[in-house]
Amino acid sequence: MGIEGALDKGFVTTNLDSLINWGRTGSMWPMTFGLACCAVEMMQTGASRYDLDRFGIVFRPSPRQSDVMIVAGTLCNKMAPALRKVYDQMAEPRWVISMGSCANGGGYYHYSYSVVRGCDRIVPVDIYVPGCPPTAEALLYGIIQLQNKIWRTNTIAR
């Protein structure tokens, strides 16, 4: 899959989908939506030990600047409209990672009257990261799986 022998003539050919997806996988800008204890693990993933910058991942403070939303923690009914509003402010294409048991399906508080039983009822989720709370390695693996999913997506030829 390398280009070692292709540069003999001075140019390389590829399709535009591969080029765009290569750029998207190498420059994901997530916006954090930390709601509970899973947000601490998300912060740890962005710190120097795991260093998401080496994957081209830079946390952005605004939804208008991000293309990935990481929902971490218990989503309450009162917070659900805010989650949807922030998701709608993100530019296309956009992806969502659901981090932790509470964001995936309500977790420990599943039977509480005030908890949404999974953030996928509010926004479409692309990657689920299990755990209570999931480790930083699990979130990193989920981000790598999202990069693989983006790489396989047909961007132009739909």
UniProtKB/Swiss-Prot annotation:
It catalyses: a quinone + NADH + 5 H(+)(in) = a quinol + NAD(+) + 4 H(+)(out). One of its GO terms (cellular component) is respiratory chain complex I. GO terms for biological process: aerobic respiration; electron transport coupled proton transport. [4Fe-4S] cluster binds at residues 37-38, 102, 132. It is a peripheral membrane protein. It is found in: Cell inner membrane. One of its GO terms (molecular function) is NADH:ubiquinone reductase (non-electrogenic) activity. It comes from the Bacteria. Its cofactor is [4Fe-4S] cluster. Its EC number is 7.1.1.-. Keywords: 4Fe-4S, Cell inner membrane, Cell membrane, Iron, Iron-sulfur, Membrane, Metal-binding, NAD, Quinone, Translocase, Transport, Ubiquinone. Its main location: membrane. SUPFAM superfamilies: HydA/Nqo6-like. Pfam families: Oxidored_q6. This is NADH-quinone oxidoreductase subunit B.
